[in-house]
Amino acid sequence: MALVSAVPLNSKLCLCRTLFGFSHELKAIHSTVPNLGMCRGGKSIAPSMSMSSTTSVSNEDGVPRRIAGHHSNLWDDDSIASLSTSYEAPSYRERADRVIGEVKNIFDLMSVEDGVFTSPLSDLHHRLWMVDSVERLGIDRHFKHEINSALDHVYSYWTEKGIGRGRESGVTDLNSTALGLRTLRLHGYTVSSHVLDHFKNEKGQFTWSAIQTEGEIRDVLNLFRASLIAFPGEKIMEAAEIFSTMYLKDALQKIPPSGLSQEIEYLLEFGWHTNLPRMETRMYIDVFGEDTTFETPYLIREKLLELAKLEFNIFHSLVKRELQSLTRWWKDYGFPEITFSRHRHVEYYTLAACIANDPKHSAFRLGFGKISHMITILDDIYDTFGTMEELELLTAAFKRWDPSSIECLPDYMKGVYMAVYDNINEMAREAQKIQGWDTVSYARKSWEAFIGAYIQEAKWISSGYLPTFDEYLENGKVSFGSRITTLEPMLTLGFPLPPRILQEIDFPSKFNDLTCAILRLKGDTQCYKADRARGEEASAVSCYMKDHPGITEEDAVNQVNAMVDNLTKELNWELLRPDSGVPISYKKVAFDICRVFHYGYKYRDGFSVASVEIKNLVTRTVVETVPL
């Protein structure tokens, strides 16, 4: 957080220029930043990996300010407004509903004696394959009852050695056991990872044949997927991940380009914690049906694929309307005039759409996009643009939580403050209608804590103080903002979240503490160099180096990444532990938001440099449809 001291604050500060006048003066400054926006015709985007250094500037009020040189909004609002789709027609919804009925009939066949899914030599694997397929194709919300019935059947035959392909197979099967371990664990069933011990040789090692067949490769691929759902202390899962990763990388060097190789590359790259459901669905639609090792009737595969494509494209038509609504909101609040800040509202909305594809969850998607965008504006104010005196005023205004507080704010802050005040109150009131308790006060307290963490960092920078690692992390878990990006959108989802249950997900729960710590640490490993270049010394890496004199920067980064890995296993346990008293589906919302930000920091600070991976994500998941 780079701060500069301003001239002594006086009453004239409350009589600054209007937001738009102030913004106009900044346009000359902003012109030095590369223009990466989508062209008016919406035909191209010019991505850039470069970031200009922080620049000191002086305005007519004599206050030196700094801007970080972030690239501009990538998505021209006219292009968003012109997004078109033919899938709004009722005929597509009617067709999808018809196919849903047909797929339900396929699930029903599982209970028919000697049916296609009930052979005693393959019924368990058939059921697991069906559940896994509808989940990866993004259509599982239509089949909750059928999924539960299928998994109950599989679990009834689960043993300490795993399962075979069928209830009468007699021999355990790696593919079925690995897929079962993963799927059952994710649905809250108690299953031990020790089942994998039975697939090691006498030396305690996983082995493979000299000739890697497609069937064996798929066995190991499911072993890899299972190994990622690891709990703390599960050495067998660590060994399985190491073995399967090595095996699959070796296989990629030998097999020709195919749907299988594409799937392997995708899963090795994104694993589980950076794998967003709609992103995986888009990949899986392309490769589904190419598995020739498992005898499933062609018609069943075609029905699942048809439904997946229909649902993907129908949801696309809803996304179009929601994005247009979000863009209007962005313009109505004057955000385009704030030219010193990042504008990532389209990207944030896309990330929400990638984890919440139920049409009923529009308030969640839009709420996440709005809150995340406003946090980004505040981040750029507190990090670079605001003076210490102005930040004290803004912090005091948030503590008052009153529109009259803007009277003593610089005008460039007034619009931002009112946007936060209006939108958080509006979301909280809507959530209160759903939840039946005072969510407005709850939201206000969470924002006070968030802003308090921001000003604490500002004071550290202003005084030149570098905190200890523990001191930094405790504050950083709050200043990252993941709690407030989760809280209000989650309360609008329609299911009851009484305070008793919410406290198991939100602050001060272990679950919340883990998600906030993971994101703060992961974010810092990608941001600390750019932050340091702007004079923002405090980061998890720098503070760890302070606490451990003589350690190299590379080793410090490795240590922080190791912490993230360990905390991630703890988070897996908090999500899936059977004795929590909170449904997994409730915690999964907060967990998926953690995955969203984890994805954003996978390669770099993807929220500052959004012109590479996240730009491609927007294109693949919300701009383009899939051919039927």
From Swiss-Prot:
The keyword Transit peptide applies. Binds 3 Mg(2+) or Mn(2+) ions per subunit. GO terms for molecular function: magnesium ion binding; pinene synthase activity; terpene synthase activity. It holds the Pfam family Terpene_synth_C. Keywords: Chloroplast, Lyase, Magnesium, Metal-binding, Plastid, Transit peptide. GO terms for cellular component: chloroplast. It is an enzyme of class 4 (lyase). Its EC number is 4.2.3.121. Its cofactor is Mg(2+); Mn(2+). Mg(2+) 1 binds at D379, D383. GO terms for biological process: alpha-pinene metabolic process; diterpenoid biosynthetic process; green leaf volatile biosynthetic process; terpenoid biosynthetic process. A motif (DDXXD motif) lies at residues 379-383. It catalyses: (2E)-geranyl diphosphate = (1R,5R)-alpha-pinene + diphosphate. Pathway: Terpene metabolism; oleoresin biosynthesis; Secondary metabolite biosynthesis; terpenoid biosynthesis. It comes from the Eukaryota. Mg(2+) 2 binds at D379, D383. Belongs to the terpene synthase family. Tpsd subfamily. PANTHER family: (E,E)-GERANYLLINALOOL SYNTHASE, ENT-COPALYL DIPHOSPHATE SYNTHASE, CHLOROPLASTIC. The Asp-Asp-Xaa-Xaa-Asp/Glu (DDXXD/E) motif is important for the catalytic activity, presumably through binding to Mg(2+). Monoterpene synthase (TPS) involved in the biosynthesis of monoterpene natural products included in conifer oleoresin secretions and volatile emissions; these compounds contribute to biotic and abiotic stress defense against herbivores and pathogens. Catalyzes the conversion of (2E)-geranyl diphosphate (GPP) to (+)-alpha-pinene. This is (+)-alpha pinene synthase 1, chloroplastic. It comes from Pinus contorta.
